[in-house]
Amino acid sequence: MYNHNLLEEKWLQLWKTKQVNRFFDDKTKPKYYILDMFPYPSAAGLHLGHVRAYTITDVLSRYHKAKGFNVIHPIGFDAFGLPAEQYAIASNKHPGDWTDKNITNFIEQLTAFGFDYDYQLSLKTTDPRYYQYTQWIFGQLFEAGLAEVKEIDVNWCAELGTVLANEEVLIDSNGNAVSERGEFPVTKRKMKQWVLKITAFAESLLNGLAELDWHQSIKEMQTNWIGKSEGVEVTFDIENSKETITIFTTKVQTIFGVTFLALSNSHPLVKEVAKTNPKIAQFLQKQAQKTTTVKQPETLHDGVDLKLKAINPATNTAIPLYVANYVVEGYGTDAVMGVPAHNENDNFFARKQKLPIITVIDKQERLQHSGQFSGLNSQTANTQITQMLVERQKAKKTTVYKLRDWIFSRQRYWGEPFPILFDENNQPHLVKELPVTLPALANYQPDGSTNPPLWRNQEWAKVKQGNQTFTRETSTMPQWAGSCWYYLGYLMLINNENFWPIDSREAKDLFERYLPVDLYVGGAEHAVLHLLYARFWHQFLYQKGIVTTKEPFKKLINQGMVLGPDGKKMSKSKGNTINPTPLIDSHGADALRLYLMFMGPISAALTWLDDGLNGMRRWLDRVHNFFHKENIIKETVDQETVYGYNLFLKRSFEHLEKQELNLVISQMMIFLNLLYKTKQLTLAYAKGFLTVLSFFAPYLAEELNAKLGMEPFIVHAQLPNVDNSVLETDKVKIILSVNGRFKGTKEFAKGVDEQTVLKAFKTDPEFQALFDQPLARVVFVPNRIINVLLKSE
């Protein structure tokens, strides 16, 4: 067994000395921008999920460099916000000192894994040189009327001492609203908050999804979160009043089945009635104390009769008005038609309130009990009833979105300060001199009140300008602010130790050259948080002419989780976590990188197995040992080796193009088996093999390249060429895989059928023992592989 510790330390120092990962803005090459979702620097350091994701991008970065691309593959640290601050509080440290120390540790770990980052392009969101542009973008939003202070119902988390955006609130198993960070109770309360009008970009965000090479599930999550609905706003007159109620519906054909109107707790009419009706006021007070927000019809159908009647514009009959807790606040008009025969929520509510239930659409989707429209199919009736109500001036066609404006202020210390001063009339004014730096604050912990920690520093909060005293905004920006644009920040560091100004000619040239990001790799959990917010900011910057692409991220890959040995999500409480750093000492970075890529497809969740890592370390020894055999390098080699080498390259490159990294490793294994059989290799073939190996195991590849006397560095080698003429044959080698594990190959005539291949393997003495159990399933890829799944005993 070779000494991986000595070998890896040797090449780590040489790469550092020679700056092999230094990025150069080479305009003679096509660009390729590959991006990791940057981590927040926790004290725990890198976990296996980090290492898996970063190895994926590292392999693909090295591959594209070898293809001749000018690859930018940067890394940074998302160091502001709740995650970092909560860890700092738990550690009884100041978040500034704590995050800087952790960043140093992260860089040491990342370096040890051999990732090809150029740390001269590294950034952290807590750097005032960086966050002045976070503040600048906010200022542009403010001047465009897309950022404003509003008194709104917010999600308040007393334990965290801050407001949370809708996207940061989860529903637990009991149906209670809890914080994404820590799962603390969340309640509704009214507060003045900064909001960003992401709703102004709802249609643009929706339309932009069509041009993105993202997994369909992520697109659907964003589509559903934006929640576009095309329908009709119908006006109901209130009996004996000049007031009206407007409802939004996508199913106006059910209007003849409306037996009540339900209003949300925040509807203006409900609030007005509550002033004189103690029963309504008591109901609203009770609802405000509840944390339950999930739609569960069997439990959430409480309401109170407002003692008012509305006139159904289709039937001209009077129907009661209720305040009901199942009506979603802030969606549509805060009021819905109660059609209990055709809506589950309405049905539960009507049964509890003993309201009539009228079926107006039969099983054949035709209307009944609907006057002149009875007998029409549902779609036709929708059109004709809409037309009738529009003619009566009781309806208009409209579009609504579920997407809400982004609550952008947090009552915490560790975040970007707002570049805002309030005058004595409480009017906001933009601060032009940036950055507005975050002041030192010894007592930064939240106290449960709505006053942010920065409010305690009155010397900072109060600003004298002439005869006026201004007050700074003492809330800070959310943790998502700095990550909305960090992919631009890396580009602003090219050819500049500082950041190019975001609106400078130099920055725009770099944006034009390197955007969009060609490949973005990160977790699917950010679908309606970071990924949606970043798209919003990018589209705004596109409108401003700062960037020249409509979308920031062209292709997105969501890597699967690395599960514990017990097949469950890793967590300290379950005792199934694995620290990757000691594995470098015991097995080497190359072995861990290879194993994480070989475990399965990129998007799959995979169970950690120690035996798998041990096996990968043994395979590296096989590679090492082969290249240390005597007389293996020949001037010429036999036809089997020529064919095998070119087939290895062809299939490896095909898999790399499809990001099938586990299958590239399979091809390396197949070719190594062939080399042990033929015991011969040309120098060019050796370099070709080591070039592919270097994508996954750069340390050993570099060592073997040097051992053969070739010029360093193999990590700078170009892709070898495939001689396709060699592969034009009537014979193919088909792989046998049993329960997902490579077992060997046999040669067959091209086009051979599945049964012939299966029979040949089953009757071959070399493979017979593998078929001692009944077959559960056989997957055959013609001319390539037969994968046999055996029944477990």
From Swiss-Prot:
Motif ('KMSKS' region): 569-573
Stored CDD domains: LeuRS_core (cd00812)
Record field: catalytic activity: tRNA(Leu) + L-leucine + ATP = L-leucyl-tRNA(Leu) + AMP + diphosphate
One GO cellular component term noted in the UniProt record for this chain: cytosol
Family matches, as InterPro entries: aa-tRNA-synth_I_CS, aa-tRNA-synth_Ia, Leu-tRNA-ligase, Leu_tRNA-synth_edit, M/V/L/I-tRNA-synth_anticd-bd, Methionyl/Leucyl_tRNA_Synth, Rossmann-like_a/b/a_fold, tRNAsynth_Ia_anticodon-bd
Example GO biological process: leucyl-tRNA aminoacylation
Cysteine disulfide links: none
Name recorded for this polypeptide: Leucine--tRNA ligase
Organism: Mycoplasma pneumoniae (strain ATCC 29342 / M129 / Subtype 1)
Gene that encodes it: leuS
